[in-house]
Swiss-Prot record:
Protein name, UniProt field: Uncharacterized protein MJ0678
Disulfide-bonded cysteines: none
Lineage, highest ranks first: Archaea, Methanobacteriati, Methanobacteriota, Methanomada group, Methanococci
Membrane topology: Multi-pass membrane protein
Compartments where located: Cell membrane
UniProt keyword terms in alphabetical order: Cell membrane, Membrane, Transmembrane, Transmembrane helix
Highest taxon of the lineage: Archaea
GO cellular component, one term: plasma membrane
């Protein structure tokens, strides 16, 4: 059972009492501490109940000078006995997911350095036909973050996060393509290279693999299951096909390069489509009631867009 420890810091004179909070559904333990003019409400709950408790605290104290902080306890004593009930999927709360998405969609110096290193490693792995180097570039997975963040921004109708994700994604795509084109211009690139040939040969399995890995990646994000994240990064790698696209353009193989671009688009669409569907299925939505309908509308539009693009690519592969 995954737990969360919630603290809500509020002005002392606004505190409404702890007895009502202790009666809330999902509260395992609750207490209040007062220090000067600040009262701190402390609540121990399960991960699956934490979002509704945070929302209730927002309703009670949202208009005040308050601050909610959520921790993940490493242990608690006495042990908590789990009640036998219908098992529900556990996921991170909305705010936790938002913080993760905002961080991975940030065009920071650190993220750009990781992008430079992973692109260089990917180019070297492709050129030398070295699978180990390619896997290393996939694990870094710099292009995965903005796509996940974009999908979450649509699900919660957050335009600032959407714009931030799109800007970061475009900047990273342009950088990878330009760096790969420069490398392709100076390196002796051959279409017989196994790593290049495998990324310009498309079939129906490309879509199946991309969708499967996209779903697994979305589940690992929403459930915070890090054990499958590495496998997902390798299975749905965005960087190698994009690097192959740039290398072939730089080497003058313009016509052949578009197959690698299509493979990249298949993977990117799969990530976004899977993420939106999984986020919606797990009940992730805006906190404000007036944004919920707006989020549902844009989620539907996004799903229709990604499905349409998938069908178009599928037809393109058949008649390619």
């Amino acid at each position: 059972m995954k737990l969360r420890f919630i603290e809500c810091h509020i002005p002392k004179h606004l505190f409404m009492g702890i007895d009502e909070i202790r009666e809330w559904d999902g509260v395992i333990w609750a207490n209040v501490k007062t220090n000067g003019t600040i009262s701190t409400i402390q609540i121990l709950t399960t991960l699956k109940d934490s979002e509704k408790i945070v929302d209730k605290l927002k309703e009670m104290y949202g208009g005040a000078n308050y601050r909610v902080v959520v921790f993940e306890p490493t242990m608690t004593y006495p042990p908590i006995e789990e009640e036998e009930e219908k098992e529900e999927p556990e996921r991170l709360i909305r705010e936790e997911l938002y913080n993760i998405a905002s961080d991975i969609a940030n065009l920071s110096k650190e993220n750009m350095l990781m992008l430079i290193l992973s692109t260089i490693v990917a180019i070297a792995g492709i050129y030398k036909d070295d699978v180990a180097l390619l896997i290393a570039s996939m694990i870094i997975a710099p292009l995965l973050g903005p796509n996940i963040a974009l999908s979450l921004s649509i699900t919660v109708a957050d335009y600032k996060l959407a714009l931030k994700s799109i800007k970061t994604l475009i900047a990273e795509l342009i950088f990878v393509i330009i760096l790969s084109m420069i490398a392709g211009h100076y390196l002796p690139i051959s279409l017989d290279n196994p790593q290049i040939h495998s990324r310009i040969t498309l079939d129906f399995w490309s879509i199946i693999i991309a969708l499967s890995a996209g779903i697994a990646g979305s589940l690992s994000t929403v459930s915070n299951i890090s054990s499958i994240a590495v496998g997902v990064m390798i299975a749905i790698a965005l960087l190698p096909p994009l690097a192959v696209f740039g290398l072939l353009i730089g080497a003058g193989y313009v016509e052949q390069s578009f197959s690698a671009l299509i493979l990249f688009l298949i993977n990117m669409i799969a990530i976004n489509l899977s993420a939106i569907v999984i986020f919606s299925a797990y009940g992730i939505s805006p906190y404000r009631w007036w944004k919920k309908e707006e989020a549902r509308k844009y989620t539907l539009y996004a799903i229709l867009l990604w499905v349409t693009l998938f069908i178009a690519i599928f037809v393109l592969i058949i008649y390619h």
